[in-house]
Each structure stands twice: as structure tokens, then as C-alpha cells.
Amino acid sequence: MKKYFHLSFFLLTIISFSCGSDKGPGINKDNLQKYLHVPSPSWQDQILYFIVTDRFMDGDSTNNDQGAGEYKKGDGAYWNGGDLKGITQKINYIQELGVTGVWITPPVANQWRNPQHTGTGNHGYWASRLDQVDKHLGDLGDYKMLSATLHSKGMYLIQDVVVNHFGDFYTYDGPYDPEDVSKNFKLHDVEQPMQYPFNHNDAREEEDRELGIYHFAPNFTDHSDTIQKTQFQFADLDDLNTSNPLVRDALRENFGYWITEVGVDGFRFDTPHMVEHDFWHSFLHKKEGEHLGIDLLAKQQGKQHFLTAGEVAFFPKPFDHSGTKEARKYLGTKNKPEMNSILNFPLNTAINRVFIEKKPTSTLSFRIKSIQENFQRSDQLLNFIDNHDAPRLLAKSDRQTMRQALLFIMTIPGVPVIYYGTEQELTGMRQTMFKGGTGSPDRDYFDTESDYFKFVQSLVKLRKTNEVFRRGQLKVVRDNSYGPGLFVYEMRLDDVSALILINTSEKLQLVDGLSVPTFNPGNYVSKYSIGAQNEILSVSHDRIIDMILEAKSAQVYVNTDHSQTKFDLHGTIGLNNDFSEILTTSAIQLSGKAMGVENMGLVIDGDYEHLLPITNRNQNSWFHDLSLSNLMNGKHRITAIGYDDKGSLITSSKYFTLALSTKHLFHFEDEIQDDYGPNGEYTYPSHRSFSHQQDIKAVDVSLTGNNLTLEITMSEITQIWIPPNGFDHVLLNIYIDMPDKQEGVKSLPFQNAFFPNQGEWDYRFALGGFGIEAFEGYPLISGPEKLGKSIMTPFVNVDYEQNKISVTLPAKMLGNPTTLKKTNLYINTWSGSAAYPRTIDKTRTTWSYGGGNSNSPKIMDDINIITLE
């Protein structure tokens, strides 16, 4: 009977995966048990939909308010009413999108209100009991109904799990003494955990200290300190002693319960990097005590590939493998395995840099290679563009950027994760899908006819109907090392090849001389496109592609599609190889041959928008004097292009390496520890992690051609919160006034201040540890609360020994100036982000400055204007 059921479910899954139209049988109490336990799928064939349960759908209003002052519909700090019944009621909506699995936030009983008034447990990550469903979300029967309904439709259920901590039931009200952990210990005056052994949480009790269920320790402030990170409290949440065999067995018992009782198909683990590695092997793969490890138990239930994916939140620095390698460690080794997957934060960090921050697409190429080298099965990793702990991509960028990022994760190896509401263009981080909830006062968001729902639906269909995107091998074939632009990659599975071309730039980009040996000569129509007018891919007789890719566009071609009429080129163009491979001068004369071509020009690094016309022609020869001052040092591609009498593009390319000398222009020293605001009365936020990270000591200015490098020496640099850009607790604001730009901006956006000496700025670079933003200023779109036009962002390098933050601003970022003489630079510091700086008031608080008011300038330290001579 069991074998028959497994086979039936396998066939049901295939049917559902193929057409997405199976609505499944009606689930009731009589047949519910039949659908609770199903075999594991091949995870690389799945697409997950991540739901914050309280924010998705209110299916039972009677459980909203539990009388603890924790419920306030419409307020993001409180419970809003979403529940398990709500998800079950909307499964047809989810299935119509095409996804094959649902991942929900922790459903276990939570601390409803934080005793220190820092919020409510609506998200599910503040457990009070591990073997019960939180009353706001429903009961065990509701959870079983959700599981069975999903399974009946060929879908799967992933549960979010927290093993690192419970809620906030105790704290330290005074200095911490590791020799006497009862000293200054305080139990909050709230209902305490009742479940054994987690009820032994009073450090003043000898029995509780001896049992060692918790690490009785204060908050940790330094994420780089392994001892603090694994044994101290995170955000005052009571840290479990996961090295204790009693705790490990209790966790195996409680989370195993959800597998046996509800039939969940996988776990996503919260904050796994705050738990020692040995725990994960024990918890998942061993029987130590009375209960089987999670993976062993799942196999016993017929789930041979139970998903165990960790939120390994490492944010690698650009072009650095260490973050990827750290994330890889949580899979363990062959002899001592841990989880079988992670949330792919290394890739997500690169996605943010390339698609949002407009950094060079080679950033993404590097991270892909790093992941391929470190993860044997990158097709098992959970790829995402949004999650519940950060602002949504659409809130930080635009629709076209989000479309490109979604297409990217849908056409590469891995398990795509769609954050709920992405398909409805929600912008709130934890906005509700239902009317009246936080961020959604006037309407529900379950419109299956909306343009964006259909867009996401079509992307899901593209992935599901083309195996090459799920099981193929990824190879990057063209990128850009100097800014936004081309990102071209191939997915290949046996004889099937898909070519994906993305242009992250807002300018036209040239794809030239691209070899596509798996495509036969001829014209191909795009399988899928975003923002493209021309959807034809022309492959020459020697299987080469030359084409113009439109701004912010993306196109997908598959070699199995029928190619149309072949074509012939009626002209030739050549670029002489009569210049050195390494160039040390700021100009060069180029020459070449051309026959049967018109509208000739030169394109540097694919930047077709800034094509340089070739006007010096003599019969079949051409010449051009090329300035190199606005190029960065490094390897560049130069392409001569033209069009034949049929309008076909003809190209010829060469590479060269630029090595211009760097000239140091200026050294400025600022007064040490003058970081107290314009009036000298500001105080830092009271959180103990703040010291003097916003104090500027010196600034050095250098030029390489017209590329500007600033080396900013700080009093101190910290990376307490493991920021991806290498520093935290400071936002460096760099304002630049270009002499050749007539209309600048006087006010400093969101800083309650003006450019010094009644001047105006043209470019602003806001450098933060967790994000870098850049803007071009215009009077009509920039102002006190208007940032300006978003532009490409620079890389930042950190020298911890010298306390230096270095940033290079390529000439391309500054409008390709002919000179930087008379350029004015102004630098100041604060913290937060460009549009959301930290607040200031008369008296400082944990995260707000003191010594001012809401109208005070948000400047902790600054330097005098530097004018380049």
C-alpha cells in the first residue's frame, strides 16, 4: 500500500509540474492523513514561495487578538492577523503563479510582546514553546490541513526553524560577571517558558545553572567574535546552550514532531552561523539520546531528501572568496555532514551590487565562479532577490531592475525563492497581502490578472518547461569590468544550450565577436525578453554574434528553437594590431581597413552609447586618435564597427591593458576627535558599539588620468556587524562640484544642511557598510528630501591596519570630464543610509543621536572643501 501511494504521488507531481493545472482533491478530516507524508522531490526542480504568515492572509479573524495588547492591524510592529488558514485558502492563487513549494516563517508558539518594548513576536522568531502552533496562527489541525492541501496539489511545505535562541525572557541589568552569572541577572516580569527543559532559565537558581540549558550571558556586539556569536545573546534573545546533549535531544524531539505530525518536507534554519558546527552534525545526522537526528527521522518517514537549508548570512567582499568559503562550511564534510543547502547570501550580495548598486557585472561573474568552486551541488542552493530582513529590491530600485534580477535567478542552477508579494510589486518589507494590514490600507493583493503577476508567472513557466535552466551547467561568456553593462551567460544541458544576454546599463551595449558554437548559423527569435525591441539573434556562418543590446534589457535564446533564414555579410572591417599590448600613455592612434561598410565608429568596453565616430577615412583605410584619460587602468576591449549595405553589423576587436601612472595631488589633515557635530555638542547613540567611527583624520587625493581616488583615514574602523563593504557605524558622504556643470544642488539631501560656501554639488556618493549609493544632482529632482538620479556606484577598499577607506571614482561616474581641475570635494559623516539617516534629538537613545533636534544638521564630522588644482 505504501509503495502504491508513493508511486501515485510521484505521478501526481509530474503532472502538476508539467502543466500546473491540477487542483487536487478536496481535503477533509477523513482523507487528510493520506496526504500528510509524501516523498521528497528533486529540489533543483522546485520553486519556493516564502511567506511571512502574519502578513499573507487572514483566514480566521477570531484568533487575531489574544488580549495581550499585541494585535494592531495596520501597524507593522504588531500582529496583523495572517494565519495558516489564510495560506490554505490562497493555495490556488499560489499554485496559479506556478511555484511548487511554500516556505513559512516559524509557526511555533511565540512570545507575543517583547518585555523591553521593542516589538512583538509576529514574525515567529521569538519562541516560547516548540511543540505548539502559536494561537495567532491557528492550531495543529490548521497546520495539518495546510500540509495535506499542498501535498494533494503536488506542492511541498518548508518550515522555518530557530535552534539558536528563545524569546526575551531575561536580561542583565548591570555589568556582567562571567564568574558569577547570577549577578545582575533579571527575569522579565512576563509569562515564562513552561516547556521542559526550556523552563530552566533562571541564572539565580543553582539547578538551572547546573542544567545549563541556556548560555547565561549578555548581548554580543561583535559578530566577528566566534565565542560571543555562539554563546552570547543576540538582540537580547535568550541563547540556548546547543552544546548541551540535553538541549540537542530536546530540539531533535520538538522539531522532529513537525515532521511526524505535519509532514513538513524541509527546514530552513534561522541564524545557523550563531550555532557551533558540531551541533548541526549531531542535530541532523545522529541519534544521541532518545531521539533520531532530523535527517534520519525524515528518511524513516519516507523523505529521502529532506531539505535542510541554513540562513548562513555571510556577505562576501567583492572579488573575495572568503565569504563563500565560510558559507560552504555549513554543509560539513563527507565524513561529518551538516546541512544540505544554504540560502545563497553570497550570490544575493552580488545581485545587489550588480543590479541595484550598478557595479561592474564582473562582480557577479566572480561570485558565480566562487560558488561553483566551493559548492559541489550549486543547484541545491536557495537563490533569492528579496527576504523579510531587508528592504525589497523594488523599494531600492525600479521595475526593470527587478525583472532582470528575477530572470537571472530563474535561469541559473539552484532553487529560486520568490518572496511573497513580489508578484504584486509590494514595496513594504513585511507588508500585508490583505486589506487593512500594514502597508495595504485600501486593498488586497491577490490579483492574478495584474501585469506583474503574469510576468512572474511567465518566468516560472519558462524555468519549468526548459530543463536546461534547472539542470544545466552555467558558464559566463561576457561581462564588464568597469561598470554596469553586459552580462552574458550560457546554460548547457547535453545538446541543449540557452544563451542569456542581460544589459544592466541604462545605455546601449555592444555584443561583438561572441562565439556561440552550440548555435547553428541563422536567425533565432527570443524565447523570452525584457525591454527589447529587436528580439532576433543573428548567428553568422562562423557562429559569431554581433548585436546591440538595448538599455536595461534581457533576452533568452535556446539553440533548439528553429533558426530562420541564414544571412551573409557584405563588407569587412579590420583593426590593425600596431599598438602595444600594454599602454602607458593617455592617447593612441588607431588604424585599420574597411570595405563595403558605412557609419563606422569605435566602441570601448561595449559602451555603444558613447560610440566614437570614425571620420578620418582614406579609400579603404581609416584612422582615429583615441584619448585614454577617462579609462581605468586594466584590460580593455576596443571594437571597430560598421554596417554593410543590408544594415548588418560588422565588427573587429582587440584587447589592450592600460597602465597609466598615478599622481598624488593633495593631503588634508582634520582635527582628531572633533566628531561632535557642527556645534560641538552632539553625542553618539548610546549603544555600546558606537565609539569614534565617524571621526575623519585625513584625506588624500590622487588622479590616474581623470579617475579620482580618495583615501580617507578614520580614527577607527570597525566591522562589528560583519558588513559586506568592510566597515560599519558610519555613512561617508562625498559631494563633488564639477566646474563644467552649470546647474548644481545647494541642499544636502536628508542632512538638514547645505553645500559649504554657498556652493552646489553635482554628484553624491553615500558609502555605507551595508550599501553604497550614488546620485547625480539636478535642481528639479534633488533637494532637502530628494536624492537625485541614481547612477553607478564605486568600489570601496578598507585597510584596517592604517584605518583607511579608499574609494576610486572613475571618470565615467563623473560624466567623462575633459579635466578635473577646479573640482571641489566635500566630505562629511553620519550613519544610516542616504535616504534614512539616523535621527537626532535633545537626548540620545540606543540608536539616535543626542545634542540637537529633528532640524539639526545630520553631520557628525566634516572636512573643509578641497579644490583640485
Predicted features and spans:
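Short, compositionally biased P/S/T/A/G/V-rich stretches that sit at domain boundaries
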Residues: 561-587, 659-686, 691-698
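Active-site-proximal helices and loops of the catalytic beta/alpha 8
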Residues: 31, 147, 165, 254-377, ...
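Substrate-binding/active-site clefts of carbohydrate-active enzymes
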Residues: 40-46, 54-257, 261-262, 282-283, ...
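Carbohydrate-interacting/catalytic domains
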Residues: 19-50, 65-68, 73, 80, ...
